Amino acid sequence: MSIMDIVNNKADAYFYIEKQLPDDVRDAGRRCVKAFDVKSRFIHFEFFRLNKDMPGVANKGEIIALEVNMRPSGGFTPDMLNYANSTNVYKIWADMIAFDRCTLSEYADKFYCIYVGRRDCNPHKNAHNEILSRYRANITMSD
């Protein structure tokens, strides 16, 4: 489901942080950094992997860029990146500006992290409080 579908259909939203970026996504990101000559900026890119051929655009399985943003991701995404990678993305950004390198140690612990945004207008099998009472030990943040 696309962001446009979520907005237009008032659908619930979800996404997750991968433990490891696929090589083609990492390569596309690095090519974007080079193409835009980005230095010491907090950036984020948004790519989609096509689930069907789109003649004139790309083939099924290939990635296409949606956005190149010269700012941090929105919402809870920076917190999710921190948790999933046992890191601090804002400290990394500050280090790039101040020292032109990262001073944080690389941590081995990596986790999956998922965001789920439920709309009040949609029916749900379980109420928010029921989910919290059942899974609180596995939920890092809830709003």
Model-found features: residue ranges?
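A short glycine-rich, hydrophobically flanked beta-strand micro-motif that places a catalytic Asp/Glu
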Residues: 39-52
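Conserved protein kinase catalytic/activation segment
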Residues: 54-64
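Short acidic, gly/pro-rich beta-turn/loop elements at beta-sheet edges
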Residues: 55, 76, 124-126
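Short, conserved beta-strand edge motifs with alternating hydrophobic and charged residues
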Residues: 44-46, 65-68
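A structural signal for short, hydrophobic beta-strand segments that form beta-sheets
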Residues: 1-3, 65, 136-141
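Peripheral (often C-terminal) accessory segments that flank ATP-dependent C-N-forming ligase machineries
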Residues: 92-143
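ATP-dependent carboxylate/phosphate-activation module, predominantly the ATP-grasp catalytic core
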Residues: 1-38, 42, 58-60, 69-97, ...
